Amino acid sequence: MDKNKNISMAVIKRLPKYHRYLNELMKNDVDRISSKELGEKIGFTASQIRQDLNCFGDFGQQGYGYNVKELYTQINSILGLDKEYNAVLIGAGNIGQAIANYSRFDKLGIMITAIFDANPKLIGIKIRDIEIRDIDELGSFLKSDSVDIGVICVPKKSAQKVSDELVNGGIRGIWNFAPIDLVVPEDVKVENVHLSESVSTLIYQLHQQR
């Protein structure tokens, strides 16, 4: 893949859905699938799927469709899921603990190597054999260990400070669960998961049905 190619974020955000469905197809021993069949399963048009995949190369064959395993492997590589990424999690409250206990991260190549919190009652407790550390140790940990991703699960008032420390520690990817839009340098990538915004969208759709 040409890393300089200008591909819209909308296309990138659809790739994980393709990836997930292709994985399910492999589990069901499906060897090949057409763009029409794939579209019917995931709610996209066949044309949309072809356009998305053509951004990264020529994967399908006319009259044959897509080889499921080959397409899965290609998308896996495009998304960077064929590599490993070390992550630190900051905030071991309910959301943080749920994320730390999510077993599928290992399959995505994401390894949570440390967990930090400011609550003295949580420090020393283990989650999946990872001991929760004092938040004051975050800076020194980032200096001594290679970390790719910071997962922020702290309250809004603490999130920007944590983000600044992650950036100063060399992290270039932040997964943010705090209800705030972080201010970061241009070369730092942030993926926000604002739960209130997500549920508000659902409520709006329910409201329109009344």
UniProtKB/Swiss-Prot annotation:
Positions of NAD(+) binding: G91, A92, G93, N94, I95, G96
Coiled-coil ranges from the UniProt annotation: none
One Gene Ontology MF term: DNA-binding transcription factor activity
InterPro entries membership: CoA-bd (IPR003781), NAD(P)-bd_dom_sf (IPR036291), Rex_DNA-bd_C_dom (IPR009718), Tscrpt_rep_Rex (IPR022876), WH-like_DNA-bd_sf (IPR036388), WH_DNA-bd_sf (IPR036390)
Superkingdom of origin organism: Bacteria
Gene Ontology BP term (one): response to redox state
A single cellular component GO annotation: cytoplasm
Major subcellular site: cytoplasm
Locations listed in the record: Cytoplasm
Residues of the DNA-binding region: 17-56
Alphabetic keyword roster: Cytoplasm, DNA-binding, NAD, Repressor, Transcription, Transcription regulation
A Pfam family that the UniProt record links to this protein: CoA_binding
Family annotation (PANTHER family): REDOX-SENSING TRANSCRIPTIONAL REPRESSOR REX, REDOX-SENSING TRANSCRIPTIONAL REPRESSOR REX 1
Subunit composition and interactions: Homodimer.
Function in brief: Modulates transcription in response to changes in cellular NADH/NAD(+) redox state.
Family membership noted in the UniProt record: Belongs to the transcriptional regulatory Rex family.
Protein name from the UniProt record: Redox-sensing transcriptional repressor Rex
